[in-house]
Amino acid sequence: MARVVFRDARIYLIQWLTKIRHTLNQRQSLNTDKEHLRKIARGMFWLMLLIISAKMAHSLWRYISFSAEYTAVSQPVNKPSRVDAKTFDKNDVQLISQQNWFGKYQPVAAQVKQPEPVPVAETRLNVVLRGIAFGARPGAVIEEGGKQQVYLQGETLGSHNAVIEEINRDHVMLRYQGKIERLSLAEEERSTVAVTNKKAVSDEAKQAVAEPAVSVPVEIPAAVRQALAKDPQKIFNYIQLTPVRKEGIVGYAAKPGADRSLFDASGFKEGDIAIALNQQDFTDPRAMIALMRQLPSMDSIQLTVLRKGARHDISIALRYRLFCPPYWKKS
């Protein structure tokens, strides 16, 4: 037992001594390393001190060897010009901008595309435009159901709920069921208007002289007879003549006045176009002026009217009883 205890104590003592020796060896090695580090740091310090001293010596030598007069920096040549240069103020800049050296600025306006006009369709109503009467109140001679009637702008057609919106030289604009429709002049009326000239009226007048119409007396109100006997110019109170234009005056549309007794008794029909008076062409504006001057001295007048493409002569007695032809003499 004692041997075992002694052996264990010896082993423990040997291990302890081994650790002590190992620790001492480590400390000795650490001291050696520290000494080497101290030597390296000391060498670096002296090296840096040597470099700094050399740099300072070189700078001092350059400062001493070069004179201050030689090393003085001369002033820039353009420096005084900068000091003396005139500065532009806002007024100068504005003056330059007003010269418009590169042209005056013109803003380009964006082009606005105009909507294209919508074409107006031709009306399908069963009506025919026979003539256009221009004047203070333009009218249109429209045929409905075989009857001709003169309508003014804004009036409504008798057989249709269509309003005359606009009257032009060769067509009429109608407003029907909220839509605008076009009623053009009939083709036969266009051709009739085209051939109605002085020569045609002259030929018609010659035929009227060669074959005069036979008239029979008709009864008219006494008030009308008395009014015409006193002043023949009052005939225009009973029969209104409105100029019809197509590249000039082609005639006068005959319409009844406030008292239509003379209009009906003389044989006029609404829509008749008077183209000649006493064999004088109505297409000449001077013919109406001559009529107004000669009317007070006339006893009767003869009107040549155009009705549905045919010409008719109507005689009116201004100072005696009124006569009208029992038949119509066509050209």
From Swiss-Prot:
Alphabetized UniProt keyword annotations: Cell inner membrane, Cell membrane, Membrane, Protein transport, Transmembrane, Transmembrane helix, Transport
Family the UniProt entry places it in: Belongs to the GSP C family.
Membrane topology per record: Single-pass membrane protein
Miscellaneous comment: In many other E.coli strains this gene is part of a type II secretion system, but in MG1655 the locus is missing a number of genes.
Residues spanning the membrane: 44-60
Record has Transmembrane as a keyword: yes
Superkingdom: Bacteria
Pfam families (alphabetical): T2SSC
Record bears the keyword Transmembrane helix: yes
Compartments where located: Cell inner membrane
Disulphide bridges: none
Chain's role: Involved in a type II secretion system (T2SS, formerly general secretion pathway, GSP) for the export of folded proteins across the outer membrane.
Organism, scientific name: Escherichia coli (strain K12)
Recorded GO CC terms: plasma membrane; type II protein secretion system complex
Protein name per UniProt: Putative type II secretion system C-type protein YghF
NCBIfam families: PRK09681.1, typeII_sec_gspC
UniProt-listed GO biological process terms: protein secretion by the type II secretion system
